[in-house]
Amino acid sequence: TFKTQEPQYMHLLTTSKNFNASCDLNQGLNHSNIIFIMVQTPNSGGTKFYDHSIVSSLLQEINAKKVKNKHIVIGCTLMPKYIDEVGIFLLEDCENTTLSYNPEFVAQGDIINGFLNPDMVLIGTHSVEVGCILQNIYNKIVTNTPAYCVMCPLDAEITKITINGYITTKISFANMISDVCDEVGADKSVVLSAVGSDSRIGTKYFKPGHS
């Protein structure tokens, strides 16, 4: 059963003619030569930051089936060097199979809109073919004209973490200024709006309490 408060989600789910859910890994692997992996990689704290145990376990399951001629694409957040130094070796028994990185940039409460209208699509791959395939897939899905940033997996892993870190820092800074305003009696909305009007800063993710 799929239930969520995400806008547009239930409408798309109930009107889709092609969506098919299954708990059978074989069915998923046999359905297409392009396999997207979207699982949790929660922040684990410490020096590793992101917990790769779930995605690694899934790659090991796929490897045990010795699939051939597949393009496997990981869409969850990874630490730098995971694709090249961990993930690809977990698929060592999969003949003619590539492993690439295509993380999403969406926020809860705006997932569908963010997916359909991305500012950019980040693709980390060593395969020119995969880069072209993914761009063609997105061109059929998105409703805008995003920038396609195609690079090696390591560069893409660092790009994803950099963007996440920058947005988190911007939100934290806005909340810090909000606290200062509350302490001295200033209007935090007026202050942050004025600061955000500077094109070098911008108002996105720069509002009191924004998370």
Q: For the regions a protein language model found, what residue spans apply to each?
A:
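Structural/interface elements that position substrates and couple domains in central-metabolism enzymes
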Residues: 1-211
